[in-house]
């Protein structure tokens, strides 16, 4: 897909910022982490413009038409995660169970990063 450089650069920059802040704020017992998801079932993903980018071979592709394309992105056989999956990761990171977790880019990515 064309024109992903700004998006990818911004994501990489945020990870660097998170790690730097985690180091700088650790002495104050402030934890800084990020959640790095794969594709998430949201309007940013599920819209006619994206459908057209993913299936240029079709005149008017639908959400159903792009599911096989999305499935190829992840190691687990799913097209995308749900917003609740991201929420659960955030709730874990802010919980006492993660009280010593800092500087972590937590993937909620169905194996996208290892594929």
Predicted features along the sequence, with ranges:
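Short, small/polar-rich loop/turn modules that mediate ligand/substrate recognition or access, typified
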Residues: 26, 31, 101-103
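Short, flexible catalytic-loop segment of classical short-chain dehydrogenase/reductase
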Residues: 37-47, 51-52, 56
């Amino acid at each position: 897909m064309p024109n992903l450089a700004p998006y990818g650069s911004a994501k990489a920059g945020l990870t660097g910022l998170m790690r730097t802040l985690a180091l700088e704020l650790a002495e104050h017992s402030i934890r800084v982490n990020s959640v790095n998801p794969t594709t998430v079932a949201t309007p940013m993903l599920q819209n006619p413009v994206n459908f057209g980018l993913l299936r240029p071979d079709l005149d008017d592709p639908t959400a159903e038409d792009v599911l096989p394309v999305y499935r190829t992105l992840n190691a687990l056989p799913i097209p995308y995660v749900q917003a609740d999956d991201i929420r659960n990761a955030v709730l874990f990171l802010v919980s006492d169970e993660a009280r010593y977790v800092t500087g972590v880019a937590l993937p909620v990515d169905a194996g996208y990063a290892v594929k």
